[in-house]
Amino acid sequence: MVLFLLLVALLSPAGEAGKIIGGHEAKPHSRPYMAFLQFKISGKSYICGGFLVREDFVLTAAHCLGSSINVTLGAHTITDQERTQQVIQVRRAIPHPDYNDETCANDIMLLQLTRKAEMTDAVSLINLPRSLEKVKPGMMCSVAGWGQLGVNMPSADKLQEVDLEVQREEKCIARFKDYIPVTQICAGDPSKRKDSFLGDSGGPLVCDGVAQGIVSYGKDDGTTPNVYTRISSFLSWIQRTMRQYKNQGSA
């Protein structure tokens, strides 16, 4: 069964350490671009990840679309009210116009914030790839998030991270019937059981300091590899959309 990697918002108690599958706790604020999203779908609360790409825009997965979206920047322990945190509401959620919730195609969304985030040591932007830049099989990347620690396990209260290897496209083509190599990336580490899991949706796949992918979907048993939206295939849409709303909703 394929599932999106979002999660009902049931955070573990503060002080309870955990991991993304096969990962470890990140150094506090070592990923200052990370965003924690809370939103509602049909009255239920969910969480996703995201990342800051402009002072007033967060990039995430389109399947993280819901109502009353709140963005927390500058967090490490998400259950604490840390001084570094900036909580900002979303003015406008802009999923890709060709997003397909049945095949998971074009799973990308921009969130315009109601005000610009203040740039600090704990809050900053991450670079996006160049147009049509491709990651290659064998390349080491990483993901981070506050998602579920494993099958039937709680979500993390502290930011977790894990190193992943970009896999050959054939692995995801065989594993997922709707995998699209042109707009998606296959990543994980089947031999070591490392990957993103529930609640990590929308977070970045980071390769050499550049956000190359967005956590999209995988199998519900926590096995790897998983599918990531290929950001380089959507650069023109990202740039065009942010230009369109450049002077709207920024403090």
From Swiss-Prot:
Chief location of this protein within or outside the cell: secreted
Chain segments annotated as transmembrane: none
Signal peptide annotation: 1-17
E.C. code: 3.4.21.-
Listed Pfam families: Trypsin
A biological-process GO annotation: proteolysis
Top-rank taxon, per record: Eukaryota
Keyword Thylakoid appears in the UniProt entry: no
Cited Gene3D superfamilies: Trypsin-like serine proteases
Residue span(s) of domain Peptidase S1: 20-243
Residues that carry a glycan: N70
PANTHER family assigned to the protein according to its UniProt record, in alphabetical order: DUODENASE-1 (PTHR24271:SF58), KALLIKREIN-RELATED (PTHR24271)
Family: Belongs to the peptidase S1 family. Granzyme subfamily.
Name of the protein this chain belongs to: Mast cell protease 3
Species annotation: Ovis aries (Sheep)
